[in-house]
Amino acid sequence: VNLQAGGTLDNRGRVEARGDTTVNADTIHSSHNSVWAAGLDDNGNTTRPGSLTLTAQHVQANGKNLATDTLAVHSQQIDLSDSQTAAGQIQLTAGQSGISTAHATVNADRLTAKTPGQFNNDGGQLVAREIHLTTPDISNLKGKINQTG
């Protein structure tokens, strides 16, 4: 699945693919009940090869964000708060506006997040074998960052 929008792409449903899912827009917004998924098999499980890439000036993905291989988000501001996000590798690259995984559940084999702004994981849960966070400011009030490897 390859989606391009010149303005806002508003996902209030499900965008699912057997392979890769790539989304480019000025703004990407996904509601709490939405799904972005890549690498789904016939039963709806992430077992097939597939990567999910979201690229926009502002990404707000508060639903389920799933990929078998890599989930990559590139944006000035990344808001994954309240989401359920899982992939083999998760790569979050944000600008000055920062990254939020507040009250989210994020699971990966390898999690990499880079921002010159704040990384907010208040009430969130990050679990990965390998975690690399590059930021000058981490807020983790009542959050959990669990590196298992």
Where are these regions (language model features)?
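Extracellular beta-strand scaffolds
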Residues: 1-3, 7-11, 15-23, 27-36, ...
